[in-house]
Amino acid sequence: MITLENLIRVGGVCHFGILTASATLPLVLDWRKSLGALPKIERQLILAWASFIVLVIIGFGTVSLVHADDLAAGSTLGRAVCGFIAFFWSFRLAWQFFVYEVRDVIEANTRWLWVGYHGLTLVFIYFAVVYAMAALR
């Protein structure tokens, strides 16, 4: 049955799926080469920021899987957590649509990269909608 709780659980699984897709990013974007040109401290900062984002996504996925019932119940804390997750992914979508310039990267690679990019966009939209529904409940 389609319930908000189950939609949140699906979101939890999708968070871990995103991490799998994100693991290919350093190879696709050839981070070794592009980051190699930066001073060491800047490379370290970028890798630290990427690590923090991974930890946040692991947290979103874990909370969504373990506490989907609490998040869907409409408590103040559950709504606040869902609101933050919805805001996070809405902000990420804004970057996807208005800031990132991916055309060259996508055209220079395979059709799978195009499919993956647009597939991730759909997942980000799913996150923004489902968690906003839970937050506004």
Residue ranges and their predicted role:
Residues 2-8, 14, 18-56, 63-74, ...:
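Interfacial loop at the N-terminal end of multi-pass membrane proteins
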Residues 20, 126-129:
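A structural signal for well-ordered alpha-helices, especially hydrophobic packing surfaces
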Residues 48, 83-85, 110-124:
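Individual transmembrane alpha-helices with interfacial aromatic-anchor signatures
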Residues 56-60, 123-127:
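Hydrophobic cores of alpha-helical transmembrane segments in multi-pass inner/ER membrane proteins
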Residues 67-94:
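Short alpha-helical packing/oligomerization segments
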Residues 90-105:
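Transmembrane alpha-helical segments of integral membrane proteins
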Residues 128-137:
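Juxtamembrane boundary at the C-terminal end of a transmembrane helix
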